[in-house]
Amino acid sequence: MSHDTNTIDSRTHEGELNKLGFWIFITAEFALFGTLFATLLTLQHGGDYAGKMTTELFELPLVLIMTFALLFSSYTCGIAIYYMRQEKQKLMMFWMIITLLLGLVFVGFEIYEFAHYASEGVNPTIGSYWSSFFILLGTHGCHVSLGIVWAICLLIQIQRRGLDKYNAPKLFIVSLYWHFLDVVWVFIFTAVYMIGMVYSG
């Protein structure tokens, strides 16, 4: 099957340059999250937990709901991009809205999770491990929130102007950003929660 090089998001030189710029940006993001992961993994073994063990605090059902919401949103985002490339604006809008709703579910549960930890006396200041934990998850959560706002602004623009060769590349870049955040979450789920549920200190 031949690859269609004339999809709506690939029809302008500016759009292609924006994609290249985004990949450079993602490289910096990998460096950021890589540093945060390295810090947390180091502090998992020998860091100060202040007596608040992850084996007692982490709740698998909550984490699974968050994981399902974010990973399924990656699937719905992919469907939205498929319809964007078919130039079916209404279907694209529908699936992007579903994606953003799932993103909001994720953010809502993360806020609930942080509030729950706070009620148990856990915050970034009590120990080195928890400081790295909140910085990593907070940074990821802020990125997800930024992605939601970014996508909403773009969808409003598309609703007003219609889907065209100028805003389609921007939507494609948003989708890449969203998939990147999902990949980061898979690492968080594995390295932070799965290990944390069986090991503290």
Curated annotation (Swiss-Prot):
Record keyword Endoplasmic reticulum present: no
Entry EC number(s): 1.10.3.-
Chief place of localization: membrane
Gene Ontology biological-process annotations: aerobic electron transport chain; aerobic respiration; ATP synthesis coupled electron transport
Enzyme class at the top of the EC tree: oxidoreductase
TM helices/strands, residue ranges: 20-40, 62-82, 91-111, 133-153, 172-192
Subcellular location: Cell membrane
Gene Ontology molecular function terms on file: cytochrome-c oxidase activity
Record-level GO cellular component terms: plasma membrane
Function recorded in the entry: Catalyzes quinol oxidation with the concomitant reduction of oxygen to water.
Annotated family: Belongs to the cytochrome c oxidase subunit 3 family.
Protein name in the entry: Probable quinol oxidase subunit 3
Native organism: Staphylococcus aureus (strain NCTC 8325 / PS 47)
